[in-house]
Amino acid sequence: GPEHLNFVFLDFKGGSAFRKLERLPHTVGSVCDLDLAHAVRALRALEAELTRREQLSAAVHASDIRDMVNPPPRLIVVIDEFHALKDQLPDYVNRLVRIASLGRSLGMYLIACTQNPMGQVSADMKANMSVSICLRVRDRLQSCELLGDGRAADLSPAMPGAAFCNDSEQVTAFRCATARDIDAVCRQIAFASRFVGSPPQPSLFTAPLPRHVKDRTVADHAPQRIRFGLADDGINLREATVSLTGGNIGVIGPQGRGKTTLLKTLARHASMADGLAVRVSSPHRRVWSSQWLHGGRCTPYASSDAPPPPHIVWFVDDADELFDPFRTDEQALSFTHALADESVSVVFAVSTIRPIRIPEHCNTRIVFPCGERTSDLMAGVPARLLDMKIGRAHV
């Protein structure tokens, strides 16, 4: 069952060979498109899974997965068009060699498929692959590469599926069976898995961040963590959350990157959480206006006789000028006082990090890269994220 055996399918030429197999309950990852970013995530996930299994094995002092009382599922990684991987992502081939060399004792097995094996599989990888299968080929050298002789070139084209298997001890002839109705097979396997109560297996990796993310209402409106988008760790996506009761939050980035949209999203979700009073302020032609929100709508909360909630969240857009130490107007003084008030969390947007001179001004920074390498690095954006698309940020 899926709790004992998992599959990862990787097709690096965008074919549809594995697309139907994605529905198998055993499948924990699949790449069937031409998106190299998706492929890189899959390879990173396999490395992370190998490391995780090494740690599990070391924790119980087991040299082989078979020695573990509760071993992880055996994982079969099937790579179609292996030569395309080598051409497009050559730096990752050596990492696959590591999986091939260390994975067997940890329950990870690699099946690499290619139309032309000549020069595609390195000597290190061959040394860790105990079985070679060769179907009909046109060139005897291709057969020699896998079988040691040219017999696969002599197979008749009238016998599709005929092949030879070299298991390092002998070469055996066989014929592959054809699965004609993959959809029906997958449906029956999925039904059987549900019938016996096999638990669903978590995915090893997800697709990259989508271009657009729809705003969704927060399910529980918990004031501790407000969900506002998707976070990406390079392998998996998860819900991005931020605490509105743990200190001030600075949203940093140039105009047009998404700061105002983010503030509006956070303010709307916060206004639907219990125990928070939400105030929103923004300048218009150098005149500041403020309003209170409750349930996503404006409310005269500030003028009400009801006691205030235990915590206030103040959203301030375009707050650069409020950091000017020479300003003494009411808005600037209120802003400065709120930054130091533990009963108030200020979520402010500024165009650069320069106004934030005191670390206590914000415990959390959400930075939209501006495109200037030095400025982005100073703002805390990792070098690998400097080329992020507009609308994406680093927390």
Where are these regions (language model features)?
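Conserved P-loop NTPase motor module
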Residues: 86-88, 127, 161-269, 363-366, ...
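Conserved SF2 helicase motif VI
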Residues: 146-152, 379-384
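Phosphate/diphosphate-binding loops
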Residues: 141, 147-163, 168
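P-loop NTPase catalytic phosphate-binding loop
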Residues: 1-62, 67-145, 154-156, 220-371
